[in-house]
Amino acid sequence: MVEQAGEPAYRAQQILDAVYRQKVESAEQISTLPQQFRQELEGQGVSVGWPRIENKFVSEDGTVRYLIAFADGQSVETVWMPEGDGGEAGDGSEAGDSAEGNRARNWDRATICVSSQVGCAVDCQFCLTALLGIERNLTAGEMVGQVCAVLKDQKVSPPEDRINLVFMGMGEPFLNYDNFMKAVRLLVKYVGIAEPRMTVSTAGIVPRIHDFGLEPTRPKLAISLNASNDELRSRLMPLNRKWNLEKLLAAARDFPLRPRERITFEYVLLREVNDGAEHATEVVELLRGIRAKLNLIALNPGPGIGFATPADERVVIFQKIVRKAGVPAFVRRPRGRDIYAACGQLKRTVEILPAMESQRL
């Protein structure tokens, strides 16, 4: 854009600085640009600034689900979780037993869950986002824009405020890899969120796991496991037919970890489907030889999903079996389940069902 206008390359840096650091909302507000260039940008309809918050829903636990709209009318969801979703890492590890609502500023850290695509093509059978199908990839600017819009609405500013990011919203980040990595670099350089405070979750795009391990600047890696054998995983996650557990776990074993770093494996527990003691034992064998930790997620319910949430005692037994084998295992507490903001519930739901009613702004 800058080159096409015949402007020097450093103008691009001025625009990025104005958008992400000065938080301008139009080209006319970028005082470092020549007036003529600003007018040209305005005349061409160039969108400068952040996406628009179209709607937001507030949970009883303080979680906020944002419906964020882009210039072409498409929208995604972004989730704000005061106190994160458990643990300093912001990835659900070391989750506590309960979380109080955080309407006031009484939190030490927060986590933002970011979307990478409009919809999702991976088609996990227990995820509401899969029901949307896939519309398009998000640009790097749209991913960063989600974060900036939420930070502005919450009146926080990293690095002064401790903000974690998880790329675990709508979409598969590794199917939009180049834009995702560009967004990471922009977030580090201009927004002030260091990559160790970011985690990306993949359903198992094996070639991109290899690529990701070679990145000089990268977030932490989480892998969505969800089954203890290929037959079950192929039924729950059709992607497994292309990259099965053998290929996926080989990529995990080869992944270059930093000191004290572990790969997080996420496991959504479905009642009497993958939540038995035999499944826990199989998971232990799968993770043998990998510096890993396991996040257990009891299914978050939603219409159109043909699975049920497991009983609490089955979750506890599963966790005990894995921990006894020496694998750190944590139960991620649900955040925003009442407003369809929890893991697997993002489907741009506007009308909240009576059983899941909460405050709407």
Residue ranges and their predicted role:
Residues V150-F330:
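Conserved AdoMet/S-adenosylmethionine-binding subsite of the radical SAM
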Residues M1-N102, R253-E261, Y267-L361:
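Auxiliary Fe-S-binding modules of radical SAM enzymes
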